[in-house]
Swiss-Prot record:
Pathway(s) of this molecule: Mycotoxin biosynthesis
Localization per record: Membrane
Disruption phenotype: Abolishes the production of UCS1025A.
Residue intervals passing through the bilayer: 386-406
GO cellular component: membrane
Organism of this sequence: Acremonium sp
Domain of life: Eukaryota
Signal sequence, renumbered to the chain: none
Protein family per UniProt: Belongs to the Diels-Alderase family.
Main subcellular location: membrane
Keywords, alphabetical: Isomerase, Membrane, Transmembrane, Transmembrane helix
Role noted for this protein: Diels-Alderase; part of the gene cluster that mediates the biosynthesis of UCS1025A, a member of the pyrrolizidinone family that acts as a strong telomerase inhibitor and displays potent antibacterial and antitumor properties. These compounds share a hemiaminal-containing pyrrolizidinone core fused with a gamma-lactone, giving a furopyrrolizidine that is connected to a decalin fragment. The polyketide synthase module (PKS) of the PKS-NRPS ucsA is responsible for the synthesis of the polyketide backbone via the condensation of an acetyl-CoA starter unit with 6 malonyl-CoA units.
Protein name: Diels-Alderase ucsH
Length: 409
């Protein structure tokens, strides 16, 4: 019998269950309801084989923007057309239902649907992370897209679901303090067919799906992030680098070759923004640690397209190395197009998503080329954060409602 979780737009729970267990079905809900700043989202992204088009969909249960008076059920759809134009739209829905139809052997599906009058967006994700399908039916957009996995599901420390099951172990779902996630479909082949305001968007490419949940709002748990997903020849690559509020970087990486994991790990390291205590603790930990893994994102400049805010990088070098295996994998990203962009109160903070190229492989071996989707975010701090939320409040008071997350170009 299916387990069902139902959430309405303005429903607030008195108490919630917050699961961090890797034994839970990959895409099933981890938060029983919304209380305070807890949030949960199902995130899908993609890029066409030619690197010109892309689709990003976020289905969230999130109180971060309740100041707008629109509830906690947000759906963001960001579309990049072949000619470089965009459709960025946010819907605030009335109800979200997630059904766990999985079995103990990871068969079955996790089904979700966000609805409002005349609107529905639904997903169906295989319990084992092998495939997913999304259907969109709104006045602006109608159609569907599918994903077929190229790599097995992965947890932040690099464990795959198959490894955990075969070894009878559990994994941590925590990427950084308060934020948890699982790469349900790290990389996949992608097929999309959407009609967006009368414009047909149909392409094949690569994509993936991440399920994330947290005990605090984005603005209070991380200073920002850099994430990428790409496929180059036989290699599938993901990297997620988040900086916590203490200035400590948590960088999770994954490299798969022809469906077989070659690297998976989490590196945590201090930065100049970190406290002296944190720097010392991490230094002593690393000195004692054997088999150290390195997961690094190094920005590059003057190679491609940059966003409008403070981070002017136009690409990155991703490097994954393991002291145990002695192997190093290196991939170069180049940003070629903007998928979407939001500014957060100043020119120094914002979020830019990119479509672009990736090339690389194992050091000393053949170099492969492909496509990648990535995004770079710097969240506002201090007075800038306060100013950002004051602007949202003024927009609501003055105009009744402004969809600040929506930009169409």
């Amino acid at each position: 019998m299916a387990r069902i979780n139902r959430q309405t737009a303005y429903q607030k729970a008195q108490e919630i269950e917050f699961s961090t267990s890797s034994a839970d079905p990959l895409a099933a809900w981890r938060i029983s309801g919304i209380k305070g700043t807890a949030w949960e989202q199902w995130y899908f992204d993609s890029i066409a084989d030619d690197g010109k088009s892309g689709i990003v969909l976020t289905m969230a249960r999130d109180a971060s923007y309740t100041v707008l008076g629109r509830g906690v059920l947000r759906v963001e759809l960001d579309v990049t057309f072949e000619d470089g134009s965009h459709h960025n739209h946010v819907d605030w829905m009335n109800e979200a239902i997630v059904e766990d139809r999985s079995s103990p052997k990871s068969t079955g599906t996790i089904d979700g649907v966000w609805t409002a009058p005349g609107k529905s967006i639904r997903f169906q994700i295989a319990a084992d992370g092998s495939a997913a399908k999304v259907e969109v039916d709104t006045p602006e957009t109608k159609g569907h897209f599918t994903l077929a996995a190229l790599s097995p599901p992965m947890y932040p420390n690099g464990e795959t679901q198959n490894e955990l099951e075969s070894q009878g172990k559990v994994a941590s779902t925590e990427l950084l303090p308060k934020i948890h996630l699982v790469q349900v479909i790290p990389t996949a082949t992608f097929e999309g067919d959407l009609m967006v305001n009368g414009r047909l968007l149909r392409f094949r490419g690569i994509g993936g799906h991440m399920h994330a949940w947290a005990q605090g709002a984005w603005f209070d748990t991380t200073l920002g992030w850099k994430v990428a997903r790409g496929v180059a020849g036989p290699f599938s690559v993901t990297l997620m680098e988040y900086t916590d509020m203490e200035g400590i970087v948590h960088s999770s990486g994954y490299v798969v070759e022809d469906g077989v994991k070659r690297f998976g790990g989490l590196e945590t390291y201090a930065t100049p923004r970190s406290s002296a205590t944190s720097q010392q603790v991490l230094k002593y930990r690393d000195e004692d640690r054997k088999g150290k893994q390195t997961v690094r994102w190094t920005p590059t400049y003057n190679t491609g397209f940059a966003g409008r805010f403070g981070d002017s990088s136009t690409g990155a070098i991703l490097q994954f190395s393991s002291a145990d295996s002695g192997e190093t994998y290196r991939f170069e990203l180049t940003h070629r197009r903007k998928a979407f962009e939001f500014l957060f109160g100043s020119s120094d903070s914002g979020l830019t998503a990119f479509l672009g190229e990736i090339k690389g492989g194992k050091i000393g071996s053949e170099v492969y080329e492909g496509v990648q989707a990535s995004n770079v975010c710097v969240l506002p701090q201090g007075w800038t954060k306060i100013y950002f939320f004051i602007c949202m409040l003024l927009a609501v008071v003055t105009f009744g409602y402004i969809n600040i997350l929506e930009t169409n170009t």
